[in-house]
């Protein structure tokens, strides 16, 4: 039996493996992928507000999304420390944060256990965002069961072709 196992192992090691035609200099250009999530439109029976990148920068010098959304109707925020940085809480139409569905490019940011979003873990988020849609009240069904009170749908900016920087000195 040992001889048979030894012979089988020897045959397995000695069989040459072929890796197909690999050309390390060949570069393939792939099609771009667009990640999108559904948003409320004109004919959707949901009250919503859209904010683009310029509007976020205008109302939000500290790069806190909670602080920027506090200027929208039916939104009440509490910010610890008063600077806009750190732990923040938000209610929309009196509904607490655990019933607000928050997505970034269609990916849910709500905590799996408490359904809250810990905004302190994602600082300077508004500098990465291209647009935000705040749906007040019952959201679209594709936003999931967390959209009972409201939905915040964010999409990030696309990759630019030239380098740039942004400085805000207040």
Model-identified regions with their sequence ranges:
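Extracytoplasmic beta-strand/coil segments of soluble accessory domains associated
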Residues: 66, 70-108, 130
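Short beta-strands and strand-coil junctions in structured, solvent-facing domains, enriched
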Residues: 41-42, 78, 99, 109-110, ...
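Flexible glycine-/small-residue-rich
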Residues: 37-39, 92-96, 104-106, 136, ...
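Short acidic/polar hinge/loop motifs at secondary-structure boundaries
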Residues: 91, 108-136
């Amino acid at each position: 039996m040992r001889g048979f196992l030894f012979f089988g192992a020897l045959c397995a090691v000695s069989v040459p493996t072929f890796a197909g035609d690999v050309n390390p200099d060949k570069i393939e250009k792939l099609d771009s992928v667009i990640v999108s999530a559904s948003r409320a439109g004109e004919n959707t029976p949901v009250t919503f507000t859209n904010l683009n990148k310029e509007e976020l920068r205008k109302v939000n010098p500290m790069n806190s999304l909670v602080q920027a959304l506090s200027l929208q109707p039916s939104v009440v925020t509490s910010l610890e420390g008063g600077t806009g940085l750190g732990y923040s809480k938000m209610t929309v139409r009196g509904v607490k944060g655990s019933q607000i569905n928050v997505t970034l490019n269609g990916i849910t940011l709500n905590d799996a256990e408490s359904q809250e979003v810990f905004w302190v873990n994602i600082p300077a988020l508004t500098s990465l965002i291209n647009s935000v849609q705040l749906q007040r009240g019952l959201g679209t069904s594709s936003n999931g069961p967390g959209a009972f009170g409201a939905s915040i749908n964010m999409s990030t900016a696309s990759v630019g072709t030239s380098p740039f920087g942004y400085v805000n000195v207040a």
